[in-house]
Amino acid sequence: MCGVLRQLMLLLLAFLSITPSCSAWNFHHQLNGTTPSNGTTTNGSSSCPLANGASSNPLQVYTIAANNITASFIPYGARLISLMVPDREGKMQDVIVGYDNPQDYVKDTLTNHTYFGCIVGRYANRIRNGTFVLDGTTYNTPKNELNKTQTLHGGSVGYDQRNWTVTALSNSSITFTLFDSGYEHFPGDVINHVTFSVNSSYGLKRPNPQTEFTARTVSLSLTEKTPIMLSPHIYWNLNAFKNETVLEDTLLELPLSSRYVEVDSRLIPTGNIGNVSSSLNGTLDFTKGKLIGKDIKSADGICGANCTGYDNCFIIDRPNNASDWTSSPQTMVPAVNMSSITTGINMLVTTNQQAIQIYSCNGQNGTIPVKGSQVARNKASGDGNGTVVDKIEQYGCLVIETEGWIDGINNPDWGQDPFQIYSPESGPAINWATYVFTAS
């Protein structure tokens, strides 16, 4: 606990050295000469202090590494673009969905808008009707989903489209910073840090070596009470596209999730909380673990209108310690256990969050290419059962978002305000998730 406290206090001290003049600009709006929806004009620069060796280029690639794990990022969206870990044969595999060319993430924003690998915010997931009420005041955020009827992932220009500043950089960690001066009509100013780090027990003469990737977002409300709910939006494929889909390859276990948030056809919460074992004949029951594809044909309509698959918020049931901002996943039972039959790669996820959103890539349709580097790696090794997967097909990946109960700000009866509403008088909003990889 002392180590956790020390690390978080250092982060908070770092906040104090960054004044509200530290602003971030939106890259694709600068390219197009447009204006963000908060009415300010992007100026193509940032007054945040850059880390030594860092660049103001939003598409500059940064790589951190430890023994048998390598992660690469770009500042555009504080985005993870590659994560290399070993499979059961010791071959390094990229288990992240995305693009090889950083420029393609900008193109994606303007076309598919997949949110590959980015940090979403200021408020992840959906806001019903793009509106919420705080202390009697109604706030309206840009409606950017379903014919502009609701808000998704923070609005039209969310954190995924901002150029975060690299404010700390080492061989095994990187920190991005974003000052949000009322973006997308959210109240008040918020300073955000996200630190990614890697660790490894390979080479330490320990049994069952493992690698570890950690994402920590720390956000402070500086001026007003406001919703804050950031989340890493990482698309995973633990079989590294050796198979067209994850349906018969990937096992998913959610041992702490016996409940889920019921949603309507727009994926907006109805206010009801369902039981995974008694609802929908157990289609959403992953408490004991099963293949993604085992019950997916029965998952008709639970991921929205005219949709078959998963796009659901699973509640993490455990003694509640998320209000303690010193809590860390190292003290917690894993909330996710996922593994690939093909590669033998296993991933355990621990988090201090209240819920996990699982999305089975229902909307992919083969129009987005698999990274050329992943295709080349599979060709070179002869993997893929004689076939080469070069397009991201439906159910070709899985998104895991560590976050709070979705749209909790519009469901006060749930009692989630302490974990989603923050003010200058409150502690920081912290999303801490650790992904541990082994292979067998």
Curated annotation (Swiss-Prot):
Catalytic residues in the record: H233, E401
What one GO molecular function would you report for this record? carbohydrate binding
Q: Provide the residues annotated with a glycan attachment (glycosylation).
A: 32, 38, 43, 68, 112, 129, 147, 163, 171, 199, 243, 275, 281, 306, 321, 337, 365, 385
Q: Where in the cell is it found?
A: Secreted
Record protein name field: Probable aldose 1-epimerase ARB_05372
Kindly state the subunit structure of this protein. Monomer.
Role: Mutarotase converts alpha-aldose to the beta-anomer. It is active on D-glucose, L-arabinose, D-xylose, D-galactose, maltose and lactose.
Q: Does the keyword Secreted apply?
A: yes
Q: Which reaction does it catalyse?
A: alpha-D-glucose = beta-D-glucose
Specify the pathway.
Answer: Carbohydrate metabolism; hexose metabolism
Residues where substrate binds: N125, R126, D311
Keyword Isomerase tagged: yes
Q: What is its EC number?
A: 5.1.3.3
Tell me the organism. Arthroderma benhamiae (strain ATCC MYA-4681 / CBS 112371)
Q: Which InterPro entries does UniProt cross-reference here?
A: Aldose_1/G6P_1-epimerase, Gal_mutarotase_sf_dom, Galactose_mutarotase-like, GH-type_carb-bd
Q: Which family does it belong to?
A: Belongs to the aldose epimerase family.
